[in-house]
Amino acid sequence: IVGEVWHDARRWLQGDQFDAVMNYIFNRACLGFFGGEKLDVSKRPGGYRLKRLTATEFAQEINRLLDLYAWEVTLVQLNLLSSHDMPRFVSLVGGDKDALKLATLFQMTFPGAPCVYYGDEVGMRGGSDPGSRGGFPWDEGDWDKDLLTFFRRAIALRRNHPALRRGQYAGLLADDDQGLYAFARKGEPETLVVVL
């Protein structure tokens, strides 16, 4: 059972209520770091203030998130970039699809269950609810095919490397000057290093 909890969900994740929650803490960290200067901080999805994050601040948020739950719980959290209750990621970052690509790569390489909200993979935009719940653009001429190809490759990367699904997580670098964050996923028989 996946619950919709926008904050620290430890009391619901003790093994007697929810198995996982929609990981809005993950969402806000991704918006803050990958959205950078293009992030619209005037929006308050779920009542939470959005904040731009340096690489160091992002690393601190990720470490806090990883320390919040037992590892087995972390591995099943529903990691989302967009949802039905908030503006879509690409809309919150001023249409910056490169920011969406970086966040998606992080989502597909981070512990937990990645959740792609329908339409994000083709560049669908949408503002606050009900704008975030628009109909899927079935006309393929409206799709960002480059973005769709990127999503497919990122998903295949996760599928083809067990360490990205079950491996341990280790932060390696947070460089504010370069705006870089790096981490490793360690599992048998491989260790993968991701630099964003």
Residue ranges with predicted function:
Residues 1-3, 22, 78-79, 116-118:
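Hydrophobic faces of well-ordered beta-strands that scaffold small-molecule active sites
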Residues 76-77, 118-120, 166-171:
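Short coil/turn segments at secondary-structure boundaries
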Residues 6-9, 83-87, 122-124, 188-190:
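Short, solvent-exposed loop/turn segments at secondary-structure junctions
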Residues 173-196:
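Carbohydrate-binding surface patches
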Residues 1-69, 96-97, 106, 125-153, ...:
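Active-site-proximal helices and loops of the catalytic beta/alpha 8
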Residues 68-95:
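Active-site clefts of carbohydrate-active enzymes
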Residues 1, 84, 107, 119-121, ...:
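Conserved, mostly hydrophobic/aromatic
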Residues 6, 104-107, 111-125:
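Substrate-binding cleft of secreted/luminal carbohydrate-active enzymes
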